[in-house]
Structures are given as C-alpha cells and as structure tokens.
C-alpha cells in the first residue's frame, strides 16, 4: 500500500467502484467488440501456455477465450477476484497483463503506483497491453463529468515503461483510445 499522500483515496476508490458497478454500461463483451487493437484481437497475442492477469476485467469477457486468465477488478460483476491492483497479492507471476481502461484514474502518482503493483505480478520476460483513455468523457452518462481521468500521453508511457524496465513497442490510436504495448526481456 502506498504511503504517498497523492495516492488514490478510499473515498475516490469507492466512488469509482460504485460508478463501474451501477453506472457503467456493461454487456457480455464489455465493449471489446468496439475496439480493434484492444478488443478481441488481443486473444491472438497470447501464446499457448501463457498466463494473463486482466487488471480491471469488469465482466471478465476474455476469460472464456484465454485458458490461463485471472481477472481482478474492484467490482464484483464478473472478476475472479475482487481487489484493486494496489492490494493484489500473488505467488504466481504472469506472462502478460491487460490494463484495458483500468489504470486510468487519479494522479500520475496513483498511475505509477498501480503500474508498479501490476509489474510486480509479472515475470521478468513479460508484456503489458494497455487501452488508455486520454481523458475523453464519452461514457454516455451524466456522472462521467466526475470521473477523475488521468490524461494519458505517449510521454507517460515512455517514462513509466523505462522506470519499470520495459520498452514501448507499439503505440497507436484505437478509436477514441490509445493502444499501447510494453515488452520486457
């Protein structure tokens, strides 16, 4: 747990949990069919036998397609484990992580701390696939104005990837979001 005073407060985390449980539009696909690079195409990126940690999995739509996937989320709408990434503890180390819109809220310090927690759950040789919202308030409901989006930019990915020993190998638009791939040998 972070002792950083700029880390996400319990009140903000509860607000986000309520928002994504009750106000966020959900479906069986969780919107994955709307995106190309960060949608169902990600299934093709996973090699046989690779293990995947899906951070902020929501309704866990990739679970039925990827055998070794463990989904965590602050909501209980479909995750394998209801926990925030900052509090996720595991002995297992994963080959791949998905952060498809989940590490996307709060200050830079919160993003850094959450990223560090995710990286700590990964093997040395690993990949991270990101879908980042560059602070577009396009959820289609009135409460979105109160969502504490982080304003993602390429520079943030380059800085954080370097900090944790990764290289940004892909960065491109995916509809109104960014698709980013980090790799570490």
Where are the model-predicted features located?
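Hydrophobic adenine-recognition pocket in adenosine-nucleotide-binding enzymes
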Residues: 102
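Helix-to-beta-strand junctions that scaffold the AdoMet/dcAdoMet cofactor pocket
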Residues: 106-107, 122-124
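A conserved beta-strand element that flanks and buttresses the S-adenosyl-L-methionine
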Residues: 98
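Class I (Rossmann-like) S-adenosyl-L-methionine-dependent methyltransferase catalytic domain
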Residues: 2-88, 109, 127-185
């Amino acid at each position: 747990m972070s002792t950083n005073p700029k880390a996400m407060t319990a009140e903000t985390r509860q607000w986000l949990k309520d928002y994504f449980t009750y106000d966020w539009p959900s479906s069986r696909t969780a919107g994955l069919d709307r995106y190309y690079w960060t949608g169902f195409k990600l299934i093709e990126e996973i090699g046989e036998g690779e293990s995947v940690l899906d951070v902020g999995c929501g309704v866990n739509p990739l679970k039925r397609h990827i055998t070794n996937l463990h989904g965590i989320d602050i909501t209980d709408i479909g995750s394998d484990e209801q926990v925030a990434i900052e509090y996720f503890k595991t002995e297992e180390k994963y080959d791949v992580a998905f952060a498809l819109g989940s590490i996307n809220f709060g200050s830079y310090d919160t993003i850094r701390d959450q990223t560090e927690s995710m990286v700590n759950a990964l093997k040395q040789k690993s990949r991270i696939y990101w879908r980042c919202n560059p602070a577009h308030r396009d959820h289609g409901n009135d409460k979105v104005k109160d969502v504490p989006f982080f304003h993602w930019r390429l520079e943030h990915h380059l800085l954080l990837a370097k900090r944790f020993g990764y290289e940004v190998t892909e960065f491109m638009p995916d509809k109104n979001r960014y698709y980013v791939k980090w790799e570490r040998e």
